């Protein structure tokens, strides 16, 4: 891309509302940034139909033994990794199901490796390395919408039949042309020109949260609005698990604790045990037949 083309991108444009930010006092600086940030949720709202399509892709992939894979360089890569690594403790999903890949590898998370983003081959090879298949959904994240690393990854993903999603912050972006689903969330110029770690990153973080969370809900890992598949790995999470069980079953603290421990610290199993007055094995069998959905498991027992 020529310099003139780069400057034409919305994400590289100067923001007329913050031209005086360098001369502003500290509170005014914060107010200017906050006023720009308030535009992010509105921009995300406009692309929800496209996010729904991406969610459908990811749900179908995971339901059929595939994966949801995020790729990005710099801030975009960090966002994907952050969303992916939070899913196992929150929803007890295998780390292999939702995967975050960052250009430059794990070390690039804390030490910038900006030059790697210029290689299409690197994007392809990172997918080859994880043995990408046609069952997977690949989400390429790039605020500019023209990062070579993402272009290479999406081209390779399409070539083997994987579903592809492009997440950018510019209209008619290059990666949008390559993907089965294009999400172009237009947040406008940044408060600091070109600093896409600000509004663009906030928008992408919101969308990635929505994407993974919506898929996990559809997988039965949320009941009402409770994280019933939380991985109980410390005291705080054990207390949270007990509270969740109490919310659903109205059990006493002692009864919820006893049942949780009898259920091998599996919240869903404990809930079904209490709601159906069955043992651990029966509760697990009911959940397996219901594909992990608590309400369906209880209905199966009642019928």
Curated annotation (Swiss-Prot):
Region Disordered: start-end pairs: 1-21
Entry superkingdom: Bacteria
Enzyme Commission no: 4.2.1.126
UniProt-recorded Gene Ontology molecular function terms: carbohydrate derivative binding; carbon-oxygen lyase activity; ether hydrolase activity
Keyword Amino-acid biosynthesis: no
Species per Swiss-Prot/TrEMBL record: Bacillus pumilus (strain SAFR-032)
Described purpose of this protein according to its UniProt entry: Specifically catalyzes the cleavage of the D-lactyl ether substituent of MurNAc 6-phosphate, producing GlcNAc 6-phosphate and D-lactate.
Subunit annotation: Homodimer.
Record protein name field: N-acetylmuramic acid 6-phosphate etherase
Note in the entry: A lyase-type mechanism (elimination/hydration) is suggested for the cleavage of the lactyl ether bond of MurNAc 6-phosphate, with the formation of an alpha,beta-unsaturated aldehyde intermediate with (E)-stereochemistry, followed by the syn addition of water to give product.
Top-level EC class as recorded in UniProt: lyase
Pathway connected to this protein: Amino-sugar metabolism; N-acetylmuramate degradation
Key words, A-Z: Carbohydrate metabolism, Lyase
Location of the active site: 86 (proton donor), 117
PROSITE patterns: GCKR, SIS
Reactions catalysed: N-acetyl-D-muramate 6-phosphate + H2O = N-acetyl-D-glucosamine 6-phosphate + (R)-lactate
Name of the gene this protein is made from: murQ
Family (UniProt): Belongs to the GCKR-like family. MurNAc-6-P etherase subfamily.
């Amino acid at each position: 891309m020529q310099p003139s083309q780069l400057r034409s991108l919305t994400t590289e444009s100067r923001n007329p509302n913050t031209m005086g930010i360098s001369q502003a006092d500290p509170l005014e600086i914060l107010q200017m940034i906050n006023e720009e940030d308030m535009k992010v949720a509105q921009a995300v709202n406009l692309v929800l139909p496209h996010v729904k399509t991406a969610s459908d892709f990811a749900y179908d992939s995971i339901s059929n033994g595939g994966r949801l894979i995020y790729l990005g360089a710099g801030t975009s890569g960090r966002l994907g990794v952050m969303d992916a690594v939070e899913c196992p403790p929150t929803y007890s999903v295998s780390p292999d199901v939702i995967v975050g890949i960052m250009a430059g590898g794990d070390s690039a998370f804390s030490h910038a490796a900006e030059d790697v983003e210029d290689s299409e081959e690197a994007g392809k090879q990172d997918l080859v390395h994880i043995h990408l298949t046609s069952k997977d959904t690949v989400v390429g994240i790039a605020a500019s919408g023209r990062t070579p690393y993402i272009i290479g990854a999406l081209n390779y993903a399409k070539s083997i039949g994987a579903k592809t999603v492009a997440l950018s912050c510019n209209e008619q972006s290059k990666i949008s042309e390559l993907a089965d689903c294009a999400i172009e969330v237009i947040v406008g110029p940044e408060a600091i020109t070109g600093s896409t770690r600000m509004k663009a990153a906030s928008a992408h973080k919101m969308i990635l949260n929505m994407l993974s969370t919506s898929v996990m809900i559809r997988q039965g890992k949320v009941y009402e609005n409770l994280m019933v598949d939380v991985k109980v790995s410390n005291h705080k999470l054990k207390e949270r698990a007990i509270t969740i069980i109490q919310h659903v079953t109205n059990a006493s603290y002692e009864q919820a604790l006893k049942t949780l421990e009898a259920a091998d610290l599996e919240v869903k199993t404990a809930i079904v045990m209490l709601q159906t007055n069955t043992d651990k094995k029966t509760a697990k069998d009911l959940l397996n037949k219901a594909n992990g959905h608590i309400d369906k498991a209880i209905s199966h027992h009642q019928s």
